[in-house]
Each structure stands twice: as structure tokens, then as C-alpha cells.
Amino acid sequence: MNKHTNKKKLGALMVLAYASCAAQISANIAKDCAAPLAGGYTGRGVLIAIEDIKTITQDGSNPRIITAIELKAGRKLSVIDNVFSPSPLTGSTTQSNTDDGMMKFRKSMVLQVPVRGADASKDIVEPSFQAPLGYLAILEKKDRSGDGSFEAIGFEQGLTANADGITRNEYENGGCTMLTMSCNETVFEYSFFDTDYDTTKTAFDALLAESY
């Protein structure tokens, strides 16, 4: 999958050829007039338990691009549908940090859970912090440019609910439970993308069909 690491054999040992992590900006910081940026999420997405994923395929030239996701046989994923919200996933952020002494990006996803009761507690809220490996989220954005239209969060370190990330106030957000899930990753943005927007949208819709 990831072809950017070179290896060479030395006797009985396998050693990695040196590759510097240093980099410099290599693209213009300018608006794309042909495809202007459109901010915001549609409110649709999927949440996949990492342990239920069979394979994740990455682009050979840029491993930040996830081209395909295959679930293990018989496994399902959870559809995120916050389309009813006037500003879905508000509060979702990506912010750089050096909490463990290395530059990483703290990513947070804020969902509204529009159901309640014992089943919602058992099947949605409590498992948000109980999954051993966490979750991978694919979130649909309003931007339809292609690369970047479907954000992937939790590829390196699975998303889990924050320690204080589960709240409910009956007089706010329509009584929905607010669920904040976070992870730390070394890459600013992973994108679910294959070929063009239409191809990727078809793949995203196929994931929706694998829901509970």
C-alpha cells in the first residue's frame, strides 16, 4: 500500500534507507478559481470500528489518500445522519499540538445523537468509548471538488469519546446527546478519494449500504 519507504538488504538484516522528514511548502497558497472552497459538512458520514476493517488501501504516491475500505465478512458500520441540524458537526476541529513532545494534530468530531433510551445508551453512547481500537470516521463535506470532499478521521489512532465528551441537556440541541470523539494523528488531513468526486461518492454510498 504505502510505497514511499525504500528498503535494501544488508546480509541477514533488513535496514531502512535514510529518508529525511524535513519538507518545505511546495504549492501555491492561493484560491482555486475553477473549484472554490465550500466550507461545512453535509451531516452525513460513517463510523467504522477499526477491528471490523479487513483492508484499507492507500494511494501509492500520497498515502494521505485512502482509496478503498473493505469490512470483514458479516461486519456492519454505523451511519452518521446529522442532516437535520442547521449546522451539522459544529465544533469539529483539527488543531496542531505537541502534547507528547512531537508535532501532531488533535482532531475532534462532534455529533448529535438524535435518539434516546436504554437501547441508544447500550448500542451508541457507551460503545463510543469502549471499542478496543476506536473508530474510523468518513465525513461528507459540502465541497464537491473531489480530493478533500470526504474527510477521514481516525486512520492512525482510532477515534474514541473524550473523557468529558458525552453530554445532554434537555433544553439544548433538541434534547440530543452531544458526542465528542477525538484522536491524535501525525497527518493534518486524510482524504477518502478515488479518481474523481463521482467515483468517490459512489464508493461512499456503498459504505452507507453496509450499515446496521
Regions found by a protein language model. Name each.
Residues 1-2:
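Intrinsically disordered, low-complexity terminal tails
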Residues 9-12, 18-108, 157-171:
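Solvent-exposed edge beta-strands and adjacent loop segments
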Residues 50-53, 114-118, 142-144, 158, ...:
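Generic structural motif
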Residues 86-154:
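Structured, beta-strand-rich domain cores
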Residues 156-212:
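Mixed-charge, glycine-accented linear interaction segment located at domain edges/termini
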